């Protein structure tokens, strides 16, 4: 189970896995050797698996699922489940009900409405809200038991991922000769030990892996979590609604596009990120002011940003993080220059890696552009493993010019963002070459190459004309990449 080392630089070892807690894992370990880094990785994956077996709401065999099937019985539970239920009690009180595992009752009403393609009835929503408000369990600290009191569906999301990441990071640091660790699961990140990590905050309006971030943070011994409504939701009669609901009203929480929270305690970061997405700016500001060491950035529906007083202190000085009090005026579209890439357009490349039902290492992937003469123009993405296996990406590696520019680096860094599904990635091309200059309009080849260490190989290649007319191509899947969509369109 688990990934093998991807990058080794200055005694920092990097691992990637897919399908970890329903999303993707990035792990960085500062260790004295490959062997010690491997041990730290094994400790992280073991701790994640152990706690998932206790807390998962999606595994019918988990301790939580088995407890949820009981009614009115004082059931002895593990330390992790007891602590998690207790934390939910605390956060439900702190947020005046904005954070509640029983929100699943409301979410199911909206899911059913989306399937039927009609708005949910007010009576149905009111009934769901009423079931949320009742008590769902009682805890006995002396006996260490939990009694399930209601039949309301419960899902332990929100801060639970951060809770597990916290313990996984501690497990890595407990390994001999490991001095630092960064654990990033689905955009929730914990940085511990000697490492200082550069973290990009995804823009909810342009959330491709290589899109320009909203902010560039430098964190040490801290956690950051992001919640947002831009990757999932409900579509009803042509209208999109947030998958994040306010359990107090039964309505989708669509006032906040993205909420990013920094705190030393990962649980606080995770709980507040979700809560702020529900509560809105004013209520969030009030709650944050009652807690020390919490910084945040909210992106509101109109695009304006709300930031805590200390947010910019954690940002890289190279980034302009000026807070917008109101939405910026729309920029005029660039005037196309004859014979040059139309700057009003961009290329989206949407990949879905082949899905497995267990954690599996991410394959080597290179995505690059060639001109009509097959001359390499730009490497858009490079997901490395051990450098000696880069030759497995034989077509990309053959282009010496591209290799010399990108070898030894992973072109996508650590990102905090709303959780995405495992193996699903989007990257963009802005029509510029590796030197940052716009290319000529015309015909190019989009190349996607994937290889697994000691495993299978896949090459995808699509010719496309980039002259200002939107177009889409769907590439057939294969052993490593299940599907790929290439979309040339006006930039959003």
Where does each model-flagged region fall?
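Mature catalytic core of soluble alpha/beta enzymes
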Residues: 1-336
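Short, compositionally simple motifs enriched in small residues
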Residues: 96, 280, 440-441, 453-454, ...
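A short, polar/charged loop-to-alpha-helix boundary motif
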Residues: 265-270, 387-395
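Primarily secretory-pathway and cell-envelope proteins
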Residues: 330-382, 386, 455-492
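Surface-exposed coil/turn segments at beta-strand junctions on protein surfaces, enriched
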Residues: 340-342, 420-422, 439-441
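Extended, solvent-exposed segments with strong compositional bias
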Residues: 393-437
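A short tyrosine-centered beta-strand micro-motif
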Residues: 425-427, 439-449
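Surface-exposed loop/turn motifs at beta-strand-loop junctions within extracellular Ig-like
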Residues: 433, 450-454
């Amino acid at each position: 189970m688990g990934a093998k080392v991807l990058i080794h630089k200055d005694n920092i070892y990097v691992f990637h896995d897919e399908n970890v807690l329903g999303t993707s894992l990035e792990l960085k370990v500062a260790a004295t050797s490959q062997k010690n880094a491997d041990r730290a990785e094994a400790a992280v994956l073991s701790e994640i698996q152990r706690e998932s077996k206790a807390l998962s709401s999606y595994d019918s065999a988990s301790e939580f699922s088995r407890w949820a099937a009981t009614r009115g019985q004082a059931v002895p539970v593990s330390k992790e489940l007891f602590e998690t239920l207790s934390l939910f009690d605390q956060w439900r009180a702190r947020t005046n009900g904005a954070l509640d595992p029983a929100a699943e009752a409301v979410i199911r009403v909206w899911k059913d409405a989306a399937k039927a393609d009609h708005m949910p009835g007010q009576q149905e929503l009111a009934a769901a809200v009423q079931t949320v408000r009742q008590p769902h369990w009682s805890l006995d600290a002396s006996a260490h038991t939990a009694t399930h009191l209601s039949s309301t569906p419960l899902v332990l999301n929100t801060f639970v991922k951060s809770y597990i990441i916290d313990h996984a990071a501690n497990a890595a640091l407990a390994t001999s000769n490991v001095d630092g660790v960064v654990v990033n699961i689905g955009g929730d990140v914990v940085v511990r030990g000697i490492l200082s990590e550069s973290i990009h905050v995804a823009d909810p309006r342009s959330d491709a892996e290589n899109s320009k971030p909203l902010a560039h943070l430098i964190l040490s011994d801290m956690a950051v979590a992001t919640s947002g409504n831009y990757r999932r939701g409900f579509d009803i009669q042509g209208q999109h609604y947030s998958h994040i609901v306010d359990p107090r009203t039964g309505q989708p929480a669509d006032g906040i596009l993205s909420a990013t929270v920094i705190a030393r305690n990962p649980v606080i970061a995770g709980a507040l990120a979700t809560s702020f997405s529900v509560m809105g700016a004013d209520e969030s500001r009030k709650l944050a002011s009652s807690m020390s060491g919490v910084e945040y950035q909210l992106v509101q529906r109109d695009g304006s940003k709300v930031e805590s007083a200390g947010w910019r202190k954690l940002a890289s000085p190279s980034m302009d993080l000026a807070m917008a009090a109101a939405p910026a005026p729309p920029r005029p579209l660039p005037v196309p220059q004859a014979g040059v890439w139309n700057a009003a357009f961009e290329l989206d490349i949407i990949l879905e890696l082949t899905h497995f039902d267990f954690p599996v290492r991410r394959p080597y992937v290179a995505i690059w552009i060639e001109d009509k003469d097959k001359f390499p123009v730009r490497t858009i993405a490079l997901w490395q493993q051990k450098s000696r296996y880069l030759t497995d990406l034989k077509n990309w590696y053959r282009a010496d010019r591209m290799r010399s520019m990108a070898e030894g680096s992973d072109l996508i860094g650590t990102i905090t963002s709303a959780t995405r599904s495992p193996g699903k990635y989007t990257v963009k091309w802005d029509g510029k070459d590796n030197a940052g200059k716009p290319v000529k309009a015309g015909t190019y080849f989009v190349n996607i190459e994937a290889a697994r260490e000691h495993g299978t190989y896949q090459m995808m290649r699509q010719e496309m004309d980039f002259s200002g007319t939107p177009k889409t191509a769907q590439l057939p899947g294969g052993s490593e990449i299940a599907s790929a969509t290439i979309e040339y369109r006006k930039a959003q």
